[in-house]
Each structure stands twice: as C-alpha cells, then as structure tokens.
C-alpha cells in the first residue's frame, strides 16, 4: 500500500452502517456479511463518510484521542487493510 496518509478511500455503495451503543455495525450487501467497529473504528468510519482523505482522518483522530503518531499510523494501517480486504472501502485513484 502506498503511504497511508496520501491515499483517499471511498466507502463501497454496497455497505450500510448503523451505530449501536457507540460502536458501528457494517453490512456488506454483496457478501451479506456483518462487520463490527469499536469506538475508534467507528470514529474513523464517520470521518471517512465526511472526507476520503486519510491525512484528515489521521489528524482528527490524533487530536481527539490520547495516542502517539506512530501507534496511530500502525493502527490505521491495520484497520484500512482489513476494510480493503473485506471490500468495504476502495482506494480512490
């Protein structure tokens, strides 16, 4: 994957989301699979709905949560890889 902060992500139109108790449940209509996001994953998902720019997502999460830049970069990379692998998001060219 290219530099995480330089990519733009687009949420698949086949994915529907619903917040439940501070977490988010994602339903992929193509695979009929459910996915769950914790509190921070939910915030990332909300930010992706507002902006496809990972740099903006990174900066917002960094200011809202008590996390070091290096750890956030690693955690976002893992989350983005899982979302891509599941087909929930796509990289914008």
Q: Where do the protein language model's features map onto the residues?
A:
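Long, charge-rich, low-complexity alpha-helical segments
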Residues: 33-93
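Acidic, low-complexity/disordered tracts enriched in E/D and polar residues
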Residues: 1-42, 46, 92-93
């Amino acid at each position: 994957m290219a530099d995480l902060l330089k990519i733009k992500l687009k949420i698949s139109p086949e994915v529907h989301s619903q917040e439940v108790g501070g977490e988010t449940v994602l339903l992929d209509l193509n695979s009929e699979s459910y996915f769950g996001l914790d509190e921070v994953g939910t915030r990332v998902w909300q930010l992706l709905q507002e902006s496809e720019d990972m740099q903006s997502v990174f900066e917002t999460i960094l200011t809202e949560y008590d996390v070091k830049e290096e750890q956030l970069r690693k955690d976002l990379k893992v989350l983005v890889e899982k979302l891509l692998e599941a087909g929930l998001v796509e990289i914008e060219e």
